[in-house]
Amino acid sequence: MKKLFEKIKAFLDIIFFSLKLTVQASPKYFSFYILLSVFVIILPFAVIYVSSLLIDLLAGVSENSVRHEMIKSLAVLIVSLLFLNVMSKTVESIKLYLEGLYNEVITIKIKHQIMEKAAGIDLYCFDSHEFYDEINDASNNSTFIIQISFQVLDFIRYFVQFCIAFASLLFWNYILPFFLVISVIPSILMKNKQLESVYSFQREHMKDERKIYYIMNMALSREYAKDIRIYNLFPLLSSKIMNTWNHLYRSKKKITKKYTKILVAADILPEMTTIIILFLLGLSVIEGSGTIGDFNYYQGIIGQVIAGLYMIIYNYGQIYDGK
């Protein structure tokens, strides 16, 4: 329990540090970014809702329907859907443009902080190699700090998006949404675990990767070309590369195969839960307590819940591992 609280505290410290950095870098850009994020959160739900209204309209067409009224309603919904989709694309483009500018502002802010810190240090520190190691480390990690800062903002956005989608499902049923979340978590955790395992494997075997590239560079280098031909060294170089590559390939294959088997089983759980929910939604339509539009609406909401939960856990892992 103590370790859990320590992890939560460490994660919250990262969030507060990142938010403080992004706000201090440019309050104006931060405000614009938050405003655009709000639109990014709301627009998918608006599209899902309008789509459900459109389906209800088309499903309710009958011989007794007033033709011109139906056409008018259809036109309004189609135009609304077009407007929302265009707005969604526009907001995403503006957000991407703003991220590029915001990135530059945060970068210069971090560099300025490094300079400010160095300016306040005693002169004798400049004679120490440890000082320059720290400065180089801070400079090299500045890009990573910026990446984490944007991931924190994304984490908050996906969390809010998930909460809205989850609350929408609760309006339909108080129990099944919890089962949906519980069924999705193992699959997401295993996917992240697989990525972490492959990444850790690659880090552990960087020496072997460098060995392969070094031998390849030797074989392609003019400097060694003559010796390779005179002493017939190509078979030796080739065998070294293939032996090293085969070892890496078999090891990586073993890791991915192990997690693939687990993922196959884990991916079944959310699909089964989703099918049960859709079946119950279908029954409500047949019994008359729901509409076809409701079926489409909640199907979209389920997708938002699953996608939001996946991105929350993914960004959490990226942020916490990069602390």
Name the predicted role of every residue range:
Residues 233, 277, 298-323:
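Cytosolic ends of transmembrane helices, especially the final helix of ABC transmembrane type-1 domains
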Residues 1-44, 63-77, 95-99, 116, ...:
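Membrane-integrated ABC transporters
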Residues 31-91, 168-198, 272-279, 283-296:
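Transmembrane helix-loop-helix hairpins at lipid-water interfaces of multipass membrane proteins
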Residues 223-236, 255:
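Pre-NBD coupling/linker segments of ABC/ABC-like ATPases
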Residues 47-54, 95, 99, 114, ...:
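Hydrophobic/aromatic residues in alpha-helical transmembrane segments
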Residues 97-116, 123, 179-223, 239, ...:
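Cytoplasmic coupling helices
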